[in-house]
Amino acid sequence: MSLLQIQGLTASYDRSPVLHDVSLEVPQGGFIAVVGANTAGKSTLLRCVSGLLDKVSGSIVFDGHDILRLPPHRIPELGIAHVPEGRHVFPEMTVEENLYLGGYTRRRDGAALKRGCDEVYALFPRLLERRRQAAGTLSGGEQQMVAFGRALMLKPRLLLLDEPSHGLAPKVVEEMHQAMIDIHRSGLTILLVEQNTRLALSVAEHAYVLQSGAMVLSGPSRALMEDSRVREAYLGL
């Protein structure tokens, strides 16, 4: 059963088309990746799901309901959390204050928010040590953990991850890799877009290749890892 189904999605910025007739499915409990070059349109795809683009056509169906025309503030209320590229933490607020913002739809349940923070700290122990520290003073990797944890505070049904490894040190990339595996094992459905093809194919069950705004390949991640076109274009093999 598909939790998210995108069909014939076309999107543009002003008069510049970015996505062309894109279709994909994310099954309930699945881990799907979209890989491609830096200008392929991957981030635009997630922005469409989050309701952040106006010039779109096609259909985006979440749990049986078309959400293409919903305003952005309605998307998190449905259980869709988006970790954007660039982290976008609130620098003057503490780590814990940033996390609490992610749980705003449950803001009247203080006990649930506390449990949510504890779960994030279990996933990223480093954040527990820095919970009273201003987020703007953290390293890039730690800020990525805050952005990731803030999304999890929503208790989402679908997690959208936009280039979570971008600009991070190899050790932090390994931590993010393990975190993605752990939260997927807990039952969370994930749609990941990632330029690091090797990372994406190592964690996702199924993947799509986006090239110049169009889907050109799809299949089980293991099969794509062995596909000569993917190996040459994206894995440097």
PLM regions and their residue ranges:
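ABC-type ATPase nucleotide-binding domains, specifically the catalytic core motifs of the NBD
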Residues: 14, 55, 70, 95-115, ...
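ABC ATPase C-loop
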Residues: 151-152
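Conserved ABC transporter NBD signature motif
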Residues: 58-66, 78, 112-117
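The feature captures the beta-strand-to-loop junction immediately N-terminal to the Walker
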Residues: 35-37
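Conserved ABC ATPase signature
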Residues: 134-138
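Helix-to-loop junction immediately C-terminal to a conserved catalytic motif
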Residues: 50
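Catalytic Walker B motif of ABC-type/P-loop ATPase nucleotide-binding domains
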Residues: 159-163
